[in-house]
Regions:
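Conserved N-terminal phosphate-binding loop of PLP-dependent enzymes in the Aspartate aminotransferase
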Residues: 1-187
């Protein structure tokens, strides 16, 4: 943010996937103490309804005049009502706090599993890298067979983005399924 200020550049942050409590703060950039000029958001903003939005500082917003920008999912009354309800729910229930607390708990449990090389997470955005003997796709398929939906994003990496209302008990169940899957792959 200082670099942008020093060089008279705008700082734009994309919070489409990471915004609205996912990373343990209302917006992910808030974890870093930076001040963007424009923030884009979608996905969690609508609670399942199609909507996208941007927020801008007052100074930057002056540049937006009627017809100077467009949107695919902006402004629909039903989606806007859903977004307002969703934002109230996220903030009133402190789902950012839950994401941080449960995300830290989940990561600590995952780090203890066999063959885990590294767990990377921020809130409830969680990646697990396994050693070279365990394939991410194999873990994904084994977990799916055990009714846990995850994704593989590399040869040895899985990613999980649980709901913001997930509990520690539900994370324990997920860890048990992943551990069972890993053990089945060792054979």
């Amino acid at each position: 943010s200082k670099f942008c200020d020093d060089n008279e550049m705008l700082l734009l942050i994309d919070e489409v996937q990471t915004g609205w409590c996912r990373t343990g703060a209302v917006m992910s950039y808030m974890n870093y103490g930076i001040k963007p000029d424009i923030v884009s958001m979608a996905k969690a903003l609508g609670g399942g309804m199609p909507i996208g939005a941007i927020c801008a500082t007052a100074e930057v917003a002056k540049a937006f005049t009627a017809g100077s920008h467009g949107t695919t999912f902006g402004g629909h009354p039903v989606s806007c009502a859903a977004a307002l309800a969703e934002v109230n729910e996220l903030l009133d229930r402190d789902l950012a706090g839950n994401a941080k607390k449960v995300g830290d708990y989940f990561a600590a449990k995952l780090e203890k599993l066999p063959h885990v090389k590294e767990v990377r997470h921020q809130g409830l955005l969680v990646g697990v890298e396994f050693d070279d003997t365990i394939g991410g796709v194999d873990v994904k398929h084994g977990c799916l067979d055990r009714h846990l939906l995850i994704t593989a994003i590399g040869a040895h990496i899985i990613r999980m983005i649980p709901p913001l209302i997930v509990t520690e008990e539900e994370c324990d169940k997920a860890v048990a399924i992943i551990e069972d899957t890993i053990k089945s792959l060792e054979k």
